[in-house]
Regions:
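Bacterial N-terminal signal peptides
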Residues: 10-19
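Noncatalytic luminal/extracellular "stalk/propeptide" segments of secretory-pathway proteins
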Residues: 26-35, 42, 46, 54-167
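Soluble metallo-hydrolase cores and metallopeptidase-like ectodomains found primarily
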Residues: 32, 109, 131-160, 214-294, ...
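Short helix-loop-beta-strand segments that form the rim/entrance of peptidase-like active sites
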Residues: 51, 309-339, 347, 357
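Extracellular/luminal Protease-associated
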Residues: 54, 66, 127-226, 295, ...
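Metal-dependent peptidase/peptidase-like ectodomains
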Residues: 126-127, 227-228, 235-236, 275, ...
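His/Asp/Glu-rich mid-to-C-terminal helical/loop segments that flank catalytic regions of hydrolases
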Residues: 324, 443-499, 560-561, 568, ...
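Short capping segments at the starts of secondary-structure elements
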Residues: 645-656
């Protein structure tokens, strides 16, 4: 029997066994069934979600604070009212010294008052905590001082302070307040810090007042000063006076304290009936400054509304209880999440996927924004990407609005992996939970201008609808649903691999290349294609999580074989193109071989230490290695550094890790990868062993 006939017969038999219609009439391409979509679309309310945003944004709810706890109690009260009775708050010690893996916990903080006044050359108020809460930098402690102002530029580097006496003075800087505070106050005896957004940051918004914190260690508590945030417009006035040679005298009054606290999380569930030990996780960080409306009262409120809608539909009998548990997790961003993962190691095994809701309610016109979804990184390929993308596309074709919301079309992007929120904790290599983020870029993010008037009930409803549909699908999927998803993953995966093939071709397509440069580009191109298919094979296999019947498994194996055939075709295409370009250059075709450096790297296996789980915290290497400039010396940064660590599994060689991150992003020097991993080894985070 020919392969084509075999595949067709397998398709027919499987479709009949699962009761799938083979009609080729116009089809609904959404993976979530119409009945569930209709019920959720009717029940979910952007108006109710926005009302919760209003309530949550009234709390000044930074991590490890009483305000966070009060906001959590508000959510717990609503959950109980909706019939979800198992909500609970957990907490773990947090004091600026205790670590969970590489992450140092924040101190607790509370404040009663904070004002900053100009005394000379003219009296005027610059900042008031009561009026605008973000003007007082979090973790500021009680002071009542009058002191001279000194401009220290960024205030981040030692050379910013050369020839400048800051002791007993207040410094003005553009750097992050916590870092400036450590340099100016803790190390050099300044009294306090005033910071503003640098000129190249959100340049069209000169009146923004940012949210920042000092992040002191508990051992530094006797040296902690204070900080105020002002607008760029206000800073220009101060700099103008200083530039004119005028003495600028300020009066700062703060009533605040830091203390040993707890970092808290709150969870609630809709229990599963068939596979209760398997969990679909919806999370979002509850913390932030007051108001923090879109960031992230919107995500916290959206979770609450999804929980309400699902529980209401179940209690009415319109939906049956889910087969798998749906867990809602209101987190303290990053610091609480890592503490939760440390104290709940079962998360890695129980959680099949995570949807992180962070800034989901933007009015797209007022914020000049759009909705985006981040894909999982290549170190953690998953069906989740295609399930979510399918629902996002479906939502863009449905006229979803809210009574008091906007009527604008749904503007969205599907983005490559990016961090910056709690999904980055879950999808990290040692945790291994596929995770995506739903969010919006927003110029008002982390500023006092992140207010409720910029929250759109229509956008809230749309995003809640996508999240609820995807969560419900995962909580109930079995063979029939898995088959549809497998098709989606395989076909979209082939398209993604095709784009990577184009990237490989373009890398070779340089008319000025030498034969050696062309060979290197060819070698990298082959790596790109192989990596692309590794990613897509892994994503397709992840669908097997929902499969119980052998015919479905067999069909998915056939889809894998088809992917394999396409991989061979793509690699042949790269090889043929390389041959053509060699012919043009008049040089011989070279076979791919390993250099001596690559042969050595292929024998080196990288192993994580048992205590190194979760992402590497910023500042940990500086603290561990005793070099505060270490971050500037790192040969790898950002997503490439993150993925380099994620690909460490105790089996991959140094060369394989280098090839993986190069296939995902761009060619990375093997020397840079080894240098970075050697730094981690020196810090006790990994071991590099020779393969025996």
């Amino acid at each position: 029997m020919s392969r084509g006939k075999k595949l067709f017969l397998m398709t027919v038999l499987l479709a009949l066994s699962l009761g799938v219609s083979l009609s080729f009439s116009q089809q609904d391409t959404a993976l979530v069934c119409p009945k569930v979509r209709e019920l959720l679309l009717t029940e979910l309310s952007g108006e109710i979600a926005r009302e919760h945003v209003i309530h949550i944004s009234r709390f000044d709810r930074i991590q490890a604070s009483a305000g966070w706890h009060e906001a959590a109690l508000y959510i717990m009260e609503q959950l109980k009212r909706y019939g979800i009775s198992d909500a609970r708050i957990e907490g773990w010690p947090s004091n600026g010294e205790i670590k969970y893996y590489t992450w140092t916990t924040p101190v607790g903080w509370e404040a009663e008052f904070g004002e900053l006044w100009v005394v000379e050359p003219q009296r005027m108020r610059l900042a008031s905590y009561e009026e605008l809460p973000t003007t007082l930098v979090k973790h500021s402690v009680s002071h009542d001082v009058t002191a001279e102002l000194v401009d220290v530029g960024s205030g981040l580097r030692p050379d910013d302070y050369e020839g400048v006496d800051v002791k007993g003075k207040i410094v003005l800087a553009t750097g992050y307040t916590g870092d400036v505070h450590r340099q100016a106050v803790i190390k050099r005896g300044a009294l306090g810090v005033i910071t503003y957004m640098a000129p190249d940051s959100r340049r069209y918004y000169p009146d923004l007042v940012q949210y920042t914190a000092l992040w002191p260690r508990w051992s530094e508590r006797d040296k902690v000063g204070f900080g105020f945030n002002i607008s760029r417009e206000q800073s220009s006035m101060l700099q103008r006076w200083l530039g004119q040679g005028k003495k600028v005298l300020l009066h700062a009054q703060v009533k605040g304290k830091i203390y040993e606290s707890k970092i808290e999380m709150m969870s609630a569930t809709i229990p599963g009936t068939t596979f209760p030990e398997q969990e679909v996780l919806i999370c979002g960080h509850l913390d932030h400054y007051k108001p923090g409306a879109n960031d992230n009262a919107s995500g916290s409120a959206g979770m609450l509304e999804i929980a309400r809608a699902l529980q209401r539909l179940i209690s009415r009998g319109q939906l049956s209880p889910p087969k798998r548990t749906i867990r809602f997790l209101w987190v303290s961003e990053m610091y609480g999440t890592i503490a939760y993962l440390k104290n709940h190691p079962e998360v890695s095994q129980r959680t099949i996927a995570n949807i992180n809701l962070d800034m989901i309610g933007e009015d797209s016109v007022k914020t000049n924004s759009y909705f985006y979804v981040t894909r999982t990184p290549d170190s953690n390929p998953s069906f989740l990407n295609d399930l979510v993308e399918n629902m996002v596309i479906h939502t863009s074709r449905v006229n979803i609005t809210s009574p008091r919301g906007s009527r604008f079309p749904f503007n969205y992007r599907i983005s490559p992996y990016g961090g910056g929120s709690d999904h980055y904790m879950f999808t990290e290599g040692s945790i291994g939970v596929p995770a995506t983020m739903f969010g919006h870029p927003d110029p008002y993010h982390h500023t006092i201008q992140d207010t409720v008037d910029k929250v759109d009930s229509t956008e809230l409803k749309r995003v809640c609808y996508i999240a609820a549909c995807c969560a419900w699908w995962m909580a109930n999927a079995s063979d029939e649903e898995a088959l549809s998803l497998a098709h989606e993953v395989a076909k979209r995966g082939l398209g993604r691999a095709g784009l990577d093939l184009c990237r490989a071709m373009r890398a070779m397509d340089d008319s000025t290349a030498t034969p050696d440069e062309l060979y290197t580009a060819y070698k990298e191109g082959v790596n790109v294609v192989k990596h692309a298919f590794y990613r897509e094979f892994s994503a397709l296999r992840s669908v097997l999580l929902f499969v119980e019947k052998e015919p479905t498994r067999g069909y998915i194996r056939l889809l894998e074989e088809n992917l394999g055939a396409n991989q061979r075709f793509f690699l042949r295409e790269v090889e043929d193109y390389y041959g053509l370009l060699c012919q043009r250059l008049g040089c011989p075709v070279r076979k791919i071989t390993l250099t001596e450096e690559e042969k050595r790297a292929a024998k080196l296996i990288v192993v994580r230490s048992e205590e190194f789980k979760g992402p590497l915290a910023s500042g940990y290497l500086a603290e561990k290695l005793g070099d505060e400039t270490i971050e500037e010396k790192l040969p790898l940064r950002g997503n490439i550094a993150y993925e380099t660590i994620n690909f460490i599994d105790g089996k991959r060689s140094l060369l394989q890790i280098r090839n993986a991150v190069s296939g995902e992003y761009r060619p990375v020097e093997l020397k840079a990868v080894e240098e970075y991993l050697r730094m981690l080894e020196k810090a006790g985070l990994v071991r590099i062993e020779e393969r025996r």
